[in-house]
Structure formats: C-alpha cells, structure tokens
C-alpha cells in the first residue's frame, strides 16, 4: 500500500471531479502506465478501482477522475462527499489489466462518458510514441464530458473526434461505418457504460473483428441476477470441505463466512482480483473480466459474482 495526500481536486465536468495524489513521504510513485488503475481505500472500508489519466511515465503524482453516479454502491459518493484536499488516503500500486498492445499498426480508441480516463492516458502514450490512432469521445452533452477543452487544444487534437447525444446528427457516432473502414492491423480499445461498450464491441464482432483485436475495460457491471438462481455446493479441493451457496449469497461471501479468504476488490466481476481455479464442475460465468475463450475452458471463475451450472464446483483452495 502507498499512503498519498490529495494535493488537488477540481470539477472537470458535470458530476465529474479529478483528484491528484502525491506520495505522503515526498518520494516518487511507481510510473504511470497507459490503461493502469489503482485501488483507492475510501471512508467506510470501501475499496474502489480508478483509472489513471495523467501522462504515462509520470511519477510525481497520479490523477484519477470520478463520476458521481446515482447508481453507485457508495464509492463515488464517498469520493465526492468525503474526500478533501490535504486528506491522506491509502492506494495500491498501479495494476494494468487494460494495456496497449505492442507492435500494432493503428489503434482506434472509443470512450463513453467517464470511460475517457484510461483512454486519455492511452492517447497520450500513443501520441508520445508517434503511433497512428484516432480517439472517439462520446457523451450525452458537452457539459457532461470531461477534459473537452483540453482535448481541443492538445498536441494530438487532430486525432480526436467528439460525439454528443444532443449535438447535430452528422457528428453522432456511427460505429458501423468507422469500423468497416479500418484495416485488419487496427486494434480497438473501448471503455464506458455497459450499453455503449456492448454496441461498439457487438458491431465490431458483426463485422468480423477477431477477439484478439478487441480490448475493453468495464467500470461497472450491469445487475446480473436471475430469478432462476438456485443454491449449489462448492468443495474445497485441499480439505474436502463442502459449503452450501444459497441463492442470495455469492461464493466469495460463503467462503469468507467459513474463514476461507479469497481476495476481492470490485465485487462485480470486473477487476479479476478474485479469480480462482476450478478443479471440477461447470461455472456459470457472470464476470466481465475473462475472455470468451477463457470462459469456455471452465478452469477458472470469479467467485465474487459467478455461480455454478453444475450441482457442485470443486475449487483449488
């Protein structure tokens, strides 16, 4: 863990604030990587993940952006209402689950709303490398889009395209046309609300884009509860202990109650922290972290949100 001080906070769009962290001991932070995020420990014991958006390679400070979301489980509310300049908070070292691919001919970046934060960091990295890219930034309106004025005058402004729901029709996003015009060497990166990401990714797949060219990061998972959810068992491979997982509890909650600790963070199947190997049984994958190919192997799952299709899952614990 790293203790940091909030050195600056500013409103960058309606309901979006940017926070700047500096190391409390005055030292250097691990360098920023494009696509990386940090875990921020918030008041009330909450831990939330926020992408870094400042210049890749920076070590003097970190910058994150936080949307105050009415559907929040408490994290964004805690940031907006409880954090203030000068306060000390604990953060993790950066982790990168959304990196830029090496050796790519061209990159197509799609950001929806607050999803601009990791995408902005990627754009800065690609511009510094002098690599070919295009950034498409979508938002409901200009006042709800962060960093717009800066993007209009930055060094790579000619690579940026804006798409606002309340703008003229000719500037609205036409994902099908954009994706159809790209060569096979182009890779796609997308971050934003689930519906936005689903539209971009589904359009790409319909046009034959290979999965290894599609890169995504989810900020929040849509509710994934089924009325047909039932109970099932998990068996601990090392001890043979059998635990019942009721319909209204997750595997990680049941394991925790039994004193079996599996690290969790997002609790929504987004971050990959809790991935656990499956020895036997068939998981019901409900996460947004594993790829379709990884899910098809059924040899790992996310106990924070995924369940079981079989009567029992044997876990490598």
Swiss-Prot record:
[2Fe-2S] cluster binds at residues 266, 271, 274, 304. GO terms for biological process: lignin catabolic process. Keywords: 2Fe-2S, Aromatic hydrocarbons catabolism, Electron transport, Flavoprotein, FMN, Iron, Iron-sulfur, Lignin degradation, Metal-binding, NAD, Oxidoreductase, Transport. Pathway: Xenobiotic degradation; vanillyl-alcohol degradation. One of its GO terms (molecular function) is 2 iron, 2 sulfur cluster binding. Its cofactor is FMN. Residues 1-101 form the FAD-binding FR-type domain. NAD(+) binds at residues 105-220. Residues 232-317 form the 2Fe-2S ferredoxin-type domain. Its EC number is 1.14.13.-. Belongs to the PDR/VanB family. This demethylase system consists of two proteins: an oxygenase and an oxygenase reductase. This is Vanillate O-demethylase oxidoreductase. It comes from Pseudomonas sp. (strain HR199 / DSM 7063). The lineage of its organism: Bacteria, Pseudomonadati, Pseudomonadota, Gammaproteobacteria, Pseudomonadales. The gene is vanB.
